[in-house]
Amino acid sequence: MPKMKSVKGAVKRFKVKKSGKIKRGTAYRSHILTKVDGKHHRQMRSSKHVDTVDAKNIKEMIN
């Protein structure tokens, strides 16, 4: 049986950390950010972690 291919879009969007948690970027950061206040804009800069409910599916897509 052949190996499962990883989903390339998921590989580009997510990184698995040493602890096993999955790191992701923040949404709504592509354009029209002049309307967003400074505090929200700064908070969106930092990366987030994927929820444990979604982590299993994402790990299957990556591996």
From Swiss-Prot:
UniProt-listed Gene3D superfamilies: 4.10.410.60
Domain of life: Bacteria
GO molecular function: structural constituent of ribosome
GO cellular component terms given for this protein: cytosolic large ribosomal subunit
A biological process from GO: translation
SUPFAM superfamilies (alphabetical): L35p-like
Keyword Ribosomal protein recorded: yes
UniProt keyword terms in alphabetical order: Ribonucleoprotein, Ribosomal protein
Family: Belongs to the bacterial ribosomal protein bL35 family.
NCBIfam families on file: rpmI_bact
Protein name per Swiss-Prot or TrEMBL: Large ribosomal subunit protein bL35
UniProt organism field: Sulfurovum sp. (strain NBC37-1)
Gene name tied to this protein: rpmI
